[in-house]
Amino acid sequence: MTQATQIRRIGFDMDGVLLYNPSRIFRALISRSKQAHLFPRKELEFYHPNTNLEKLLWVLVHQSSFKMADGFSDLENFAHNNQVELNIVSARFSCLQADTRKWLKRLNRQQIFTSCNFNDLDEQPHLFKARMIDELKLDYFVEDNFDVVHYLATVQAKTEIWWLSNILDQHIAYPHKFVNFKEVVAALSQNK
């Protein structure tokens, strides 16, 4: 296969990337509080809901992903007009399966995604994403959580990790940083 006809494999996180989620700005605050040791957890250990009440609260918190990201229709056009393989790689825990299925019907309404991969076994999100990036042999992966971006960029030599930033993290330098999803799709369109 020549370089001109090579299919690019691209992966997208769901919450905060494909789905607009204004509460994602709080991730920066949570990350900083972990760095300041305000929480007794490791930097890259994500909370997992265990009790029924915790799972209910987790479902309610994820209602903040309330619409498709601005630029999603641009992604659909991009998918139909380019040699690409698009994949969803979401670390949503299994307690969110019903909501995830609902969103998947809307996100894949034009059958643009080759695969939709969800964290049904409740692995740590960064480890799940690293494993899926390897299995899918992705060329690019778009993520909105900088802690995950930093981890993946460290362990994924063959995959370019793109960061969909937020207003609280604008001071952080990163080579593949975007402020909105429309920018991501525009960059993918130019990056042939």
Residue ranges and their predicted role:
Residues 21, 89, 164-166:
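Generic beta-sheet signal
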Residues 2-6, 80-81, 134-137:
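Flexible, charged surface loops at secondary-structure boundaries
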Residues 13-14, 91-92, 145:
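Short, well-ordered beta-to-alpha junction loops that form the rim of enzyme active sites
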